[in-house]
């Protein structure tokens, strides 16, 4: 007889984080996150065709068993609801007949077992009795043998799924109606412009007659007006009694004169063209956006920087959906490299920590591991690092304990792919990405950049092993990290900088910015090397430039870490301010001031392939919070923290940085700082050589 391994249930966290242990729907750990991620990854279309993510999609456990032992002073009636078919067993007396809406547990000590099966969505469970409720005290099994499973621990729930009718699989983002600011009518066409970029369901208003309506969406006027090449499009056919969405083949009865499209689309502009005797009076947008508070704030004496922060925060808000996606038009997928930046920006703005955990779960998927996350070598390493980042900002040990077994299995898989020298080298099937570089960049051999992010992953593994109490792993990964760290300078340092790669044992003459800026950020360059990197790489125009906000995120952070905040502030004004001058209401995937409209909209061989609302474009939100307001945790969950504000050429600035239990508020003028922290531990304000202790809950004025 096999003894089944049981897992402590992980409760759903889809919404604003509330630190309670409450009654909620429950399910197998990570399954709702993986299922949700799969659903979101399949929303992408191109030219009206379905465009799936091109990596393996794992599935939820289709059948699970929940268990709890109770001791009752009196018999108790329990209401039950489940997503799927279910069977109830009390002790070993066999299953209760059918699928009753209520069942009774007799007085005394009893073990309740409830099996739930659902092939379509995770088999979730809801229970409501006087004392017996669905909460973190239940355990769940996937019927795997105990010798092959790990132990999972509970997290707190939150009240989003606090009633039987609030089924987790039915969750959707809230919607609101947005009216266009400009509408042009001409013949059988309508062209509408909204105030800023958004995502949601286009509504056709006042539809009369029969025929076909073609819809072309655009992040720019040129894209929406170019019916042939617009990236997103829809076609709807109206007859006397039915409406057919031709892209999804969804047929609905025709009632009234208004119709909402089936699929959500990104847009700022839209063209509607009617064929036949059908006509459309107007359009509105049923905007779909998460209702989450923007807890971070920033305001200063420079109106351009204020606008940059606001547009960055709005860009991130649009891409903060059921999971963190990289762009609302293209790709609408979860990418680990994009996600880790979104998480960091999120810690300084929305503080939507549930979506971070959900995306981390969804990106990881399940065992056995067969490929890199997103098929990309570097993105696997970013995934490890994102787990530790999350812990540092939130102090959430329980999540680390839940996810650590999958960290172990992923790292074990990857270590089997190291080359004979124990270094990272791309293998067949690996996408060695690094960045979309403006010039040719070798991806062959041992890239110094890849060693840096792998080393950081080993450090994250060691730290997380310590958090879960696995001393053996902590020591093992620390030793591996130290061994690799000692190889960096002898292998890649040319006396002035880290070279790009070593191929067939020979260091290249090429120097790129990537590994050098990561060496600074991760502390792998000593003081002398850091100064050399600053002068010979980061401030050297002969070194290939970085044109994506993705890697500018790290380049500008490295400059800030080296004390170049004024230079970075000027860069933000020029680069992100440049996008604003071009009319951007969200920040783009890439931006080259030399490119002209509409050619600058092209990417990936498509005239409108570039995303104009891309999460990695919002990096000023993170940079401003961490390096100008100057706030960062120095002990997990802001138990301890520091503030090193930098005013630069500003006259004044003020802002709020979220923490797990409150906010840190700072106001800075030329000779005075006001700072107050709530819901966190003791902080240290650092101005030059002066250090001031900041006590929680006390408004302090510091002059300098």
Task: Indicate residue ranges for each PLM-predicted region.
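Well-ordered alpha-helical scaffold segments within catalytic/enzyme domains
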Residues: 341-350, 383-399, 453-471, 517-527, ...
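Active-site acid/base region of carbohydrate-active enzymes
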Residues: 284-311, 317-318, 323-347, 351-358, ...
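Alpha-helical repeat scaffolds
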Residues: 530-538
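Non-catalytic C-terminal accessory modules of carbohydrate-active enzymes
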Residues: 153, 171, 486, 569-704
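Hydrophobic, well-ordered secondary-structure elements that form the walls
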Residues: 204, 396, 519, 555, ...
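Bacterial Sec-dependent N-terminal signal peptides
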Residues: 1-23
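Extracellular/oxidizing-compartment recognition motifs
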Residues: 23-322, 338, 354-359, 398
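Solenoid-like repeat scaffolds
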Residues: 506-507, 538-546, 574-580
């Amino acid at each position: 007889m096999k003894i089944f391994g049981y897992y402590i249930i992980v409760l759903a966290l889809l919404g604003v984080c509330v630190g309670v242990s409450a009654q909620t729907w429950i399910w197998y750990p990570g399954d709702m996150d993986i299922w949700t991620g799969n659903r979101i990854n399949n929303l992408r279309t191109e030219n009206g065709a379905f465009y799936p993510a091109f990596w393996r999609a794992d599935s939820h456990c289709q059948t699970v068993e929940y268990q709890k032992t109770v001791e009752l002073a009196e018999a108790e009636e329990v209401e039950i609801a489940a997503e799927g078919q279910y069977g109830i067993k009390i002790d070993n007396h066999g299953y209760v007949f059918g699928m009753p809406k209520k069942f009774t547990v007799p007085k005394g000590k009893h073990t309740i077992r409830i099996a739930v099966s659902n092939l379509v969505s995770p088999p979730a469970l809801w229970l409501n009795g006087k004392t017996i409720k669905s909460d973190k005290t239940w355990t769940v099994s996937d019927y795997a043998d105990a010798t092959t499973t790990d132990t999972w621990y509970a997290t707190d729930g939150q009240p989003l799924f606090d009633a039987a009718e609030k089924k987790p699989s039915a969750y959707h983002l809230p919607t609101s109606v947005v009216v266009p600011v400009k509408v042009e009518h001409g013949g059988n066409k309508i062209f509408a412009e909204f105030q800023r970029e958004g995502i949601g369901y286009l509504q056709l208003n006042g539809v009369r007659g029969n025929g076909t309506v073609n819809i072309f969406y655009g992040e720019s006027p040129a894209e929406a007006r170019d019916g042939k090449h617009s990236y997103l499009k829809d076609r709807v056919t109206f007859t006397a009694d039915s409406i057919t969405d031709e892209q999804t083949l969804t047929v609905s009865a025709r009632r009234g004169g208004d119709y909402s499209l089936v699929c959500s689309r990104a847009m700022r502009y839209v063209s509607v063209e009617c064929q036949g005797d059908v006509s459309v009076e107007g359009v509105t947008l049923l905007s779909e956006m998460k209702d989450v508070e923007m807890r971070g704030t920033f305001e200063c004496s420079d109106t351009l920087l204020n606008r940059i922060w606001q547009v960055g925060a709005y860009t991130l808000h649009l891409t903060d959906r059921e999971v963190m996606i990289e762009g609302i038009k293209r790709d609408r997928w979860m990418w680990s490299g994009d996600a880790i930046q979104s998480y960091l920006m999120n810690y300084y703005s929305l503080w939507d920590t549930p979506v971070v955990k959900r995306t981390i779960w969804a990106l990881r998927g399940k065992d056995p591991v067969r490929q890199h996350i997103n098929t990309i070598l570097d993105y696997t390493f970013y995934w490890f690092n994102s787990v530790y980042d999350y812990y540092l900002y939130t102090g959430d040990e329980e999540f680390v304990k839940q996810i650590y077994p999958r960290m172990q299995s992923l790292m074990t898989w990857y270590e089997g792919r190291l080359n004979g020298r124990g270094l990272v080298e791309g293998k067949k099937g690996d996408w060695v990405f690094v960045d979309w570089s403006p010039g040719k960049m070798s991806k062959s051999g041992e890239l110094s950049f890849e060693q840096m992010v792998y080393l950081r992953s080993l450090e994250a593994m060691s730290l997380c092993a310590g958090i879960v109490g696995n001393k053996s792993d902590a020591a093992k990964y620390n030793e591996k990290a130290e061994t690799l760290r000692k190889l960096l300078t002898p292998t890649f340092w040319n006396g002035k900088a880290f070279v790009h790669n070593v191929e067939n044992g020979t260091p290249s003459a090429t120097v790129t910015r990537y590994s050098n800026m990561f060496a600074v950020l991760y502390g792998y360059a000593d003081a002398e090397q850091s100064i050399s990197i600053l002068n010979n790489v980061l401030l050297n125009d002969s070194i290939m430039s970085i044109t994506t906000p993705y890697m500018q995120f790290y380049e500008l952070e490295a400059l800030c870490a080296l004390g170049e905040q004024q230079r970075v502030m000027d860069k933000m004004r020029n680069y992100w301010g440049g996008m604003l001058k071009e009319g951007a209401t969200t920040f783009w995937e890439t931006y080259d001031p030399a490119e002209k409209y509409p050619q600058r909209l092209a990417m990936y061989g498509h005239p409108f392939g570039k995303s104009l609302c891309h999460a990695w474009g919002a990096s000023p939100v993170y940079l401003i919070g961490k390096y100008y307001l100057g706030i960062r945790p120095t002990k997990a969950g802001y138990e301890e923290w520091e503030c090193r504000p930098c005013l630069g050429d500003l006259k004044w600035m003020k802002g709020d940085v979220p923490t797990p239990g409150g906010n840190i508020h700072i106001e800075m003028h030329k000779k005075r700082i006001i700072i107050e922290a709530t819901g966190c531990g003791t902080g240290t304000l650092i101005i030059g050589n002066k250090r001031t202790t900041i006590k929680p809950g006390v408004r302090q004025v510091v002059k300098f």
